[in-house]
Amino acid sequence: MFDDQQTNEPVTCSFCGKTQDQVKKIIAGPDVYICNECVDLCKEIIDEELASENAPTEITDVPTPAEIVDYLNQYVIGQEEAKKTLSVAVYNHYKRINKMAETKADEDEPELQKSNISLIGPTGSGKTFLAQSLAKILNVPFAIADATTLTEAGYVGEDVENILLKLLQNADYNVEAAERGIIYIDEIDKIAKKSENVSITRDVSGEGVQQALLKILEGTIANVPPQGGRKHPQQEFIQINTTNILFIVGGAFDGIETIVKNRLGDKTIGFGTNASTTVEEDKSLMQQVIPEDLLNFGLIPEFIGRLPILSALEKLTEEDLVHILTEPKNALVKQYKTLLGLDGVELKFTPQALHAIANQAISRNTGARGLRSIIENVMRDIMFEIPSRNDVAKVTVNKKTVIEGAEPEVELIDEQAS
């Protein structure tokens, strides 16, 4: 403790500035004082850092592809082919990491190369959500990046290393954990070359970004600025090995159907059939995309080569969207039923109302992503009024409520009792 008789000046904590009257205790050191509150804070910081350092960095029990699909089925409706492709790819990726850790010194073992993934599908088909769900079941750090914000070094915009910074931040700056994480890069189709003609000006956000991404996709020791950006040139860099980071890229690739159709147009499908009428008989055009089509779309060969696994997601139908509203563990209808249930009110959506919500999402071309904003708009007045009433037993949302904004059907407690 300290001797306050040696000076008439009030003693304050050297860290937070609080006086002895404002805290329980102040501990004295050589020309320095610390209060009990700052001691507690220091202990919390040290405990957090130790917990981060001791966090497991290996996935000891990698779920099988079947187990991964079973998990995805709880949250993702449809897209069966994509789920199967992703589950196998992710299983092999983390099995490869564990194998490499076991056989580092064995030069006779064959080298297992990383297989990053491309997801092609319309807006709102579930590309981002699939990637998030994979990271969740594997309990690995996850980060999302937008390809449209990236530029090559020397231009205004985000460096590709900032993608790794997001992953590192989500791993609480545990480098080893980040090096086994998953990064999802959205809007990857937006960095395709716009044409085959060589432009006089530099392609800042197209081919240049593809070139900048090549090394981290393949595996390199990247220097990551802990403060991000280019505003702190004197900062020390954190080195991250990207060899074991799984990269998943996604994009809508609007217009790629035409490229696929042109490729298939010269080929006869089946015996004595017209190719132009049978292109979509067995699979949708999106399901028939191959690397050659991505090349024609504007991705460079080296970039395509770093993404050997290709999976296409189909456009969600009205029936799919209705299932998304009602079936998954985190279904929006289930969430709203629970919220109103906390006020003692039962909530019901008629089948016609659910189809009307799904139809609006399709007409807006937003897919599953647009469902929340539509249902939020439908439920706003209901969620505003119900907490102020104690006579409501049940609320039924019908088609008119969704389309015209009409009042929902309300059943009162007295009516239900009678």
Swiss-Prot record:
Binding-site residues, Zn(2+): 13, 16, 35, 38
MF terms in GO: ATP binding; ATP hydrolysis activity; ATP-dependent protein folding chaperone; protein dimerization activity; unfolded protein binding; zinc ion binding
Keyword ATP-binding attached: yes
Key word Protein transport present: no
GO BP field: cell division; proteolysis involved in protein catabolic process
Chain ranges of the ClpX-type ZB domain: 1-54
Function: ATP-dependent specificity component of the Clp protease. It directs the protease to specific substrates. Can perform chaperone functions in the absence of ClpP.
HAMAP family, per the entry: ClpX
Family: Belongs to the ClpX chaperone family.
Name recorded for this polypeptide: ATP-dependent Clp protease ATP-binding subunit ClpX
Biological classification of the source: Bacteria, Bacillati, Bacillota, Bacilli, Lactobacillales
